[in-house]
C-alpha cells in the first residue's frame, strides 16, 4: 500500500542515548533545534510514541522557523494517555492511533478536537499507510522514542534517517533505537555529514538502502 516519505530524526549522546536514566533529554543545541523545526515545517505529520508523549510532554509545533504546523500523531496501542498533555491542549490537529481506548477518555479527547483512529493492529506501516489514505500525508517525521523508532526500522518503513551527535556521555538511559535488534544489523547509506554551527555537534543524514 502507498505510504508517505518517512524521515526519522533524533539527537543522541556519544554513547547512543536519547535520554539519561533520570529522563534528562535536552541534548540539542539551539542550531539543532532550529534544524529539527525546519524539518517539521516541511512535513505533513510528526509522529511520536505514547511514552515520549507522556515523559517529554512535547508540543510538536513549528516555533523556531517560519512554516505551518504538521498534524501531530501519537501511537498508543493501549490508549492510556493523559488528556492534559500539551499535544491535546494546543493547536493544531492531533491524531491518536490506538487499538482500544476507555470511553470517557475518548469523549474527553474528542471534545478537544482530537481525532481517534482505531486499528485492529498497531504497526509502523499501518499507521503511516492510514495517514496517507485518510489525511493525505505525503511526508512524515518520526521523532521518537526509541521503541517507536525501532518499529519503523524493523518494518523497513522509513526512507531517511537524520541523527545529531551531541558531545555528551550519559552512561545509561533510553537508547536511540530500542528493540530486540537484528542478527546482523541494517546498513544505511550516508549521504551527507556536517559539523553543526555550534562547533560541537555532528549532523548525519542517511537514506534507507532498498536492496
Listing of model-derived features with the role each one plays in the protein:
Residues 1-211:
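Enzymes that bind and transform nitrogen-containing heteroaromatic metabolites
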